């Protein structure tokens, strides 16, 4: 597995923060780093396989990657990321207690993926741009300024994540997308789902298309197919069982959609013919 080293990304040995844009981010094999990072998805779509679990990522997704996590990107479509790198929560010169603002693992579950709305993403970009402007300066005031900006970024993300802000339709759409990650195999009635998240059906269609480039049903089908592909690679269940477990009532229809999406049949994936990035 590829290991990325801080010496290749941080501008100096005492720099606590570095900015690494990926515009765009191509498919990239599984790797880990000797530093931490906050991955901010600017726009586009892709699959982020994080510690073996696939997540659909779109504009507004924020992922917190620790130095022992392994991850990869695949099936990317104009996926543009900004990575905010930091050595460790306890390796800042002027900041302490940052762990309290970061996601915490509870009962073996690590809430690695958050979502923010478009207006918050604009504020995030401004903070990151300010950090980039000062990246070449190594004096104490510049170091302190970068670390303060990093703290502001963490505060903004925490306050604005879907877990704490459901006041507008964009935030409710983010919550809906997170709900679909957990309920992709359910029979989805879009009228009922729109009501559940206090959105009109028209608003749901318009905003989801703006954010993902897909209609709601197309997005759900892709999500189901991504989950199915993961199971084909990492479980012994039959193709038919996987189709049913991922929300498809007809395995033949599932196979047709699968081949259309990935240009490989489920059997091809099961046998590793697609040359899956390891």
Swiss-Prot record:
Gene3D superfamilies assigned: Homeodomain-like, Jelly Rolls
Locations listed in the record: Cytoplasm
Pfam families documented for this protein: AraC_binding, HTH_18
GO molecular function terms attached to this record: DNA-binding transcription factor activity; sequence-specific DNA binding
Cellular component, GO, one term: cytoplasm
Main function: Activates expression of the rhaBAD and rhaT operons.
NCBIfam families: PRK13503.1
Protein name in the entry: HTH-type transcriptional activator RhaS
Lineage of the organism: Bacteria, Pseudomonadati, Pseudomonadota, Gammaproteobacteria, Enterobacterales
């Amino acid at each position: 597995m590829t290991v990325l080293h801080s010496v290749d990304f941080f501008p100096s040995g005492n720099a606590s923060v570095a900015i690494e844009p990926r515009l765009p981010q191509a498919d990239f094999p599984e790797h880990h780093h000797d530093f931490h990072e906050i991955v901010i998805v600017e726009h586009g779509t892709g699959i982020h396989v994080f510690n073996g679990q696939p997540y659909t990522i779109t504009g507004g997704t924020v992922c917190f990657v620790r130095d022992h996590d392994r991850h990869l990107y695949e099936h990317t479509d104009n996926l543009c990321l900004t990575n905010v790198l930091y050595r460790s929560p306890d390796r800042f010169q002027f900041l302490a207690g940052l762990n309290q603002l970061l996601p915490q693992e509870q009962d073996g579950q690590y809430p690695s993926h958050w979502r923010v709305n478009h207006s918050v993403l604009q504020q995030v970009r401004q903070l990151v741009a300010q950090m980039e402007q000062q990246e070449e300066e190594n004096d104490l005031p510049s170091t302190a300024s970068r670390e303060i900006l990093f703290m502001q970024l963490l505060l903004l993300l925490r306050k604005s994540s879907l877990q704490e802000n459901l006041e507008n339709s964009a935030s409710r759409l983010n919550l809906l997308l997170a709900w679909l990650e957990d309920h992709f195999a359910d029979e989805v009635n879009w009228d009922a789902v729109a009501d559940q998240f206090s959105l009109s059906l028209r608003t749901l269609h318009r905003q989801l298309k703006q954010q993902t480039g897909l209609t709601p049903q197309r997005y759900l089908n892709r999500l189901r197919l991504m989950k199915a592909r993961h199971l084909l690679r990492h479980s012994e269940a039959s193709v038919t069982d996987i189709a049913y477990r991922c929300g498809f009532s007809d395995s033949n229809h599932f196979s047709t959609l699968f081949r259309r999406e990935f240009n490989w049949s489920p059997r091809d994936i099961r046998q590793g013919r697609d040359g899956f990035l390891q």
